[in-house]
């Protein structure tokens, strides 16, 4: 099966819809709990907002012929060795026959404190990439193929 522009648009639209639905549900849950939280924090501390994007990547990997057992998500082991830190947990890994093919991280940035939070996200992405590439260079991974490293950011 080939990924069409319409299919990609639908996957992206569903992922964005999932993001906002989860965020709203978490905000409602926080309000109903009676516990006070700062600003929009209650809508984001529950996690899972970006799962729609991870599910979209899983579907794309399956369409591309990647076996289901080679795709690891939050429900499965996701830690990779680093160089500057012992390990890093990713949102999605593709590991086929012991070879890392891809690592993907999904992050979002919503709300009024765009500058500082966005800067933190960029530093995190750059640091994680440098850590993985240095570990790869220093032979922490099988070197049969250079893995694909991806970050997806959802910005409001």
Q: For each predicted feature, which ranges?
A:
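Charged, often glycine-rich, active-site loop that binds/positions anionic groups
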Residues: 75-91
């Amino acid at each position: 099966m080939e990924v069409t522009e319409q299919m990609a648009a639908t996957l992206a639209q569903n992922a964005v819809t999932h993001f906002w639905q989860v965020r709203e549900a978490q905000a409602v849950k926080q309000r109903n709990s009676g516990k006070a939280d700062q600003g929009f924090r209650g809508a984001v501390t529950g996690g899972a907002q970006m799962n729609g994007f991870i599910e979209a990547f899983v579907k794309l990997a399956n369409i591309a012929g990647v076996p289901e057992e080679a795709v690891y998500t939050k429900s499965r082991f996701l830690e990779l060795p680093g160089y500057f830190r012992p390990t890093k947990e990713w949102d999605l890994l593709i590991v086929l026959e012991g070879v890392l093919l891809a690592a993907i991280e999904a992050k979002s940035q919503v709300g009024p404190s765009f500058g500082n939070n966005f800067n933190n996200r960029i530093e995190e992405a750059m640091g994680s990439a440098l850590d993985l590439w240095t570990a790869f260079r220093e032979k922490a991974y099988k070197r049969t193929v250079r893995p694909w490293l991806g970050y997806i950011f959802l910005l409001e």
